[in-house]
Amino acid sequence: MIPRLTDAERAALVDLLPEWSLAKDRDAIERRFAFADFSEAFAFMTRVALLAEKHDHHPEWSNVYNRVTILLSTHDAGGLSARDIRLAEAIDGLA
Amino acid sequence: MIPRLTDAERAALVDLLPEWSLAKDRDAIERRFAFADFSEAFAFMTRVALLAEKHDHHPEWSNVYNRVTILLSTHDAGGLSARDIRLAEAIDGLA
């Protein structure tokens, strides 16, 4: 079992990942991205897919034309863990 | 404005696209796919993305690890059109 984030780690999220917000009905973080068109959105998704495989941690995500929504949570933790923070930081590094 | 499917065309969907079902709260069709892992799921998504660009018609879709859900509807028709059928048939051709 992977440990969930502590209260102190959660409090630090606002500064650490200012573009991400806590999901409403899940112990998860999410971020929405908008691009010029589908081609740019899917190019970004491809880079995120490579990151996900590298981290062995995968997003729950959706795409509608130029928009991409990414939700991160850790199944083996039953909620947010350090793995989500690391992947979110890596994704932010692309954007 | 693109014409929506007629009643006769809708009645034919069961035979034409047996793997697809009507969405519950949208005038749309959807299909769920399951793969061995994320890598296979995303490889499939990449092929669907190429089809979407070729057809100039894009899915609303989501992915969680090995699962992919695709919903097709035509914004410019306010619901299902022949474009959705053509793209669904092309996607079935990959699977």
Curated annotation (Swiss-Prot), chains A, B:
One of its GO terms (molecular function) is 4-alpha-hydroxytetrahydrobiopterin dehydratase activity. It catalyses: (4aS,6R)-4a-hydroxy-L-erythro-5,6,7,8-tetrahydrobiopterin = (6R)-L-erythro-6,7-dihydrobiopterin + H2O. Disulfide bonds: none annotated. GO terms for biological process: tetrahydrobiopterin biosynthetic process. Keywords: Lyase. It comes from the Bacteria. Its EC number is 4.2.1.96. CDD domains: PCD_DCoH_subfamily_b. This is Putative pterin-4-alpha-carbinolamine dehydratase. It comes from Acidiphilium cryptum (strain JF-5).
